[in-house]
Each structure stands twice: as C-alpha cells, then as structure tokens.
Amino acid sequence: MAQKLQADEISSIIKERIEDFELKIDVEETGKVISFGDGVAKVFGLNNVMAGEMLEFDNGDKGMALNLEETNVGVVVLGRGEGIREGSSVKRLGQLLKAPVGEALVGRVINAIGEPIDGKGPIEATEYRYVEEKAPGIMARKSVHEPLQTGIKAIDALVPIGRGQRELIIGDRQTGKTTVAIDTIINQKGQDVVCIYVAVGQKQSTVAQVVKKLEEHGAMDYTIVVNAGASEPAALQFLAPYTGVTIGEYFRDNGKHALIVYDDLSKHAVAYREMSLILRRPPGREAYPGDVFYLHSRLLERAAKLNDKLGAGSLTALPIIETQAGDVSAYIPTNVISITDGQIFLESDLFNAGIRPAINVGISVSRVGGAAQIKAMKQVAGTLRLDLAQYRELEAFAQFASDLDEASRKQLERGMRMVEILKQPPYSPLPVEKQVVIIYAGANGFLDDIEVSAIGKFEYELYSFIEAKYPQIFELIRERKALDDEIKELLNKAIEEFKASFSAE
C-alpha cells in the first residue's frame, strides 16, 4: 500500500517549490515599420535605440539604425528585405554590428557581414569585433620605417610604400589599378603579411577572376576576400570596407603585419550617397552628404604602424579611386588624396602608349615611404625621378627641334631606356634585389648601347645569368640591403660578362 504523505511534508514541498520558482521575463523593445523601400525602413516606437544599433525584423533580416528622428528611426536593411512590409515588427538587439576576425578567415571569401560565400563551409571564428572602432591615437603609433615591397619597379624605386602607410592608387577605368594592387598582394608571399582584398560594387565575374588569379599564384594562402558586389544592397557595399579593416586590425593588434586593398572607394562613396539620399539627409557637393569626408577618413585612419609597446604590428592600406577623364580635382578624389600619405597616379595615355604599369612618375608621390626604402634602392634610384622628369621635358622639346647637341641626345637615349626598364608585365612582381640590379645597370650606362626593343629580353636574361654564375650578388644585396664597393665590383663584372654574350635577336 502506497505511503501517504503527511500534511507537513506537503507544505514543505510546496514551500520548496515556491522558493525555487524563478520568473523569467524577456523584455524586448519593439517597433513597427511605417514605410519600407529601396533598402530603407522607417520604424516607429523604438524610443531608446542607439545610433548604429542592430535591429531584427520579423522576417529574420538584420537592420542598422542610422537616422534617429523625433518620431521615428531610419533603418538600413542588411539583406534583400523580402517580406518586410508596413506594420512588420522590429526589435532591438541591444548591440552594435560585430564581424568575425582571426586566422580562421584566411583563404576565405566572405560577404560584408562576415558570412562565407565561397561554398567551403562555415567559418569557425573564435573572436568577434565591433565593425566601427576608434583609430589608434598619436601615442599608440610609430613612424613608418619598414618597407612593404610591391614587386613593381616603378613603385618600389620612385613611390616607395612602408608598412603602416596609406597609399592611394588613382586613375581612370581600365588603367591597371586593380592589377597594381593584386601584384602587391602576390609579392607578399613568404613575407608574413596577411592581405585583405575588399571588393565594393564590382561585377561578380571580376571578383571571381581576382580570386582565381590569387589562387594561381598561391596568394589565397594568406589572403581574405571581402565582397559586396554591384548587385548587393547599398548598405552592404557601405559596410564592406569597415568589415575588412576590422579583420585587418585583429592582425595589426596581435603584432602581425597586414595589407588591405579597397577596390574601390569611389563606388563606396556612391553607395553611401544612395543610402543618405533615401534617408533624406541633406545633399552637398556632387549630391554627396556632408559627412562623406568622415566616411573615408575614419576608415583610412585605422591603418597604422603601432609602437613597440603595443606589439609593433602594422596595417597598410591601398585605397583605389576611379577618376572620370583624369579629373583628380573632383570631390571624392581630392578628399582621399588629402587623407592618404601619397598617391600612385595611373594615366590612360601612358597605358595606351604601352607603358605599363601606366604610372605617371611626375605626379605620383609617397609622403612617408622614403624612410622605409632600403639603402640599396635609395642608392640606385636617387636621381631616377629627376632624370625621368628631364627626359620628359627633352622629349617634348625634341619633337620640335631636330638638331640636338650630343649631351641632350645621350640624355634622351638614356631616358628611353630607363622608361623601358620600368615596364613590367602584370602578375609578375620582382624581388627588390633584382630591381636594384636592373636599375643600377640602366643608371650606370650599361644599357646605352642596347637596342630599346631588346631591353626586356636583356633584363630577364641578365637575372638568369646572375642566378647561374653570380648568385652571391642577389644574396649580398638581400643581406646587406646596401650597395658597397664589393657588390658594385661584382655587379660591373657580371653585367660586362653578360653583355659580351648577349644577342638582341
């Protein structure tokens, strides 16, 4: 017979249950969509929402509060927005946008909010960081002093880039801007630099080609691609560069070196303009909103070289700007030129004349990279910029005057060969020691009696000859990072010996 519970036992069980009872109340602040269109929703009822806070719509899409008005909130939707209609409910998530960071992202292609889009499965991220972070202050930084070799002769010799620098690549469409950036990424192989390529508003086919090119050269082993294509909502195109720089900052803050390419910030500004106009913010010059300068300055200021106390990491930025018919004085180009530490200017006239990379060395500058250039390159390229400028002047003059004196003719001949030396096929970056050798040969007159059309052949055969017969030359330049008398003597001997056997045919 079952044992009967005593009255006092029953009361003690009830008391225990009452004591253990926990009332869980889930408080959510929700609002209602008043209107929705073009990726922007007007929401009523979210009185305590923060600027930039993440919100969730009832269809699962996330949104970001950008306009905080008296009666409603302007929200950009980070998705397609299918299923959002007037009356849909929206709830606050109580946090700002975060992106996944860390080693798990290397070799992957992700979208603007850090989700993988390469079909290689989920990303096991161990850390998430806020997409909007404050740039390092003055005391946290150190002046740029280590070189970031691009592998492109014209850049490493004349417009050197240092780790932690922001160098703008600017030019018209189809002048080889992306190629310069991709070459730089390929050249970081074995340099322990993590590269991030951010594609904003590009055709998906173009991004696929870039990824394929990086894979072919083994560069995806240390590269992360962030893609917000032309078909994506403006909000995602606006966010992509910030997601990219957040990933780069993780490596910078952990004492590593990172390189980030923004391809391109013109389309980024257009996406932001689109969002701002739909949010009914007042337009300014060229219909861009008033804070379009801050849009790019807060992004590019996050690239920095940190001091030794903070781990001496660096984040180098290569923003790209597309100009219209070479107009560098438009709003966005002048903004970004004033934010960056120099610019590489690519010209369609040079490109069409077969001078590729089509860098105009006259107006391309690097404001801080000179301190990072290795001594050997400084020694051989010291007068190169001036020589090329004088050559351009003489060339223009020679079109009118037929009778040039001997010195001018020699200068013209030397200039033509130096221009030829600086040409380089795409996706074939050169190590700095090879660049030093060929520029040394040109600057010291070894090529004066070589046909201009044979310079390219001479250059690549010279590298092979030195590798076979005088490999110590490359090793010594790599180790000493300067040209001393011993290396110069060896170089002169090697070049003379090679010239004796070289045939231009």
From Swiss-Prot:
What keywords is this UniProt entry annotated with?
ATP synthesis, ATP-binding, Cell inner membrane, Cell membrane, CF(1), Hydrogen ion transport, Ion transport, Membrane, Nucleotide-binding, Translocase, Transport
The family database entries (PROSITE patterns) matched by this protein are listed as: ATPASE_ALPHA_BETA (PS00152)
Q: Record-annotated residues binding ATP?
A: G171, D172, R173, Q174, T175, G176, K177, T178
Keyword Protein biosynthesis found: no
Molecular-function GO terms, alphabetical: ADP binding; ATP binding; proton-transporting ATP synthase activity, rotational mechanism
Q: Which reaction does it catalyse?
A: ATP + H2O + 4 H(+)(in) = ADP + phosphate + 5 H(+)(out)
Mode of membrane association: Peripheral membrane protein
Q: Where is this site: Required for activity?
A: S364
- Report the EC code(s) recorded for this entry: 7.1.2.2
Localization recorded for this chain is: Cell inner membrane
A Pfam family the protein falls into: ATP-synt_ab_C
Q: What class of enzyme is it?
A: translocase
- Kindly indicate where the leader peptide sits in this chain: none
The terms describing its cellular component in GO are: plasma membrane; proton-transporting ATP synthase complex
Its family remark reads: Belongs to the ATPase alpha/beta chains family.
What this chain does, per the entry, is described as: Produces ATP from ADP in the presence of a proton gradient across the membrane. The alpha chain is a regulatory subunit.
HAMAP family the record matches: ATP_synth_alpha_bact (MF_01346)
* Oligomer status and interactors: F-type ATPases have 2 components, CF(1) - the catalytic core - and CF(0) - the membrane proton channel. CF(1) has five subunits: alpha(3), beta(3), gamma(1), delta(1), epsilon(1). CF(0) has three main subunits: a(1), b(2) and c(9-12). The alpha and beta chains form an alternating ring which encloses part of the gamma chain. CF(1) is attached to CF(0) by a central stalk formed by the gamma and epsilon chains, while a peripheral stalk is formed by the delta and b chains.
Q: Which protein is depicted?
A: ATP synthase subunit alpha
Tell me which species this is from.
Answer: Nitratiruptor sp. (strain SB155-2)
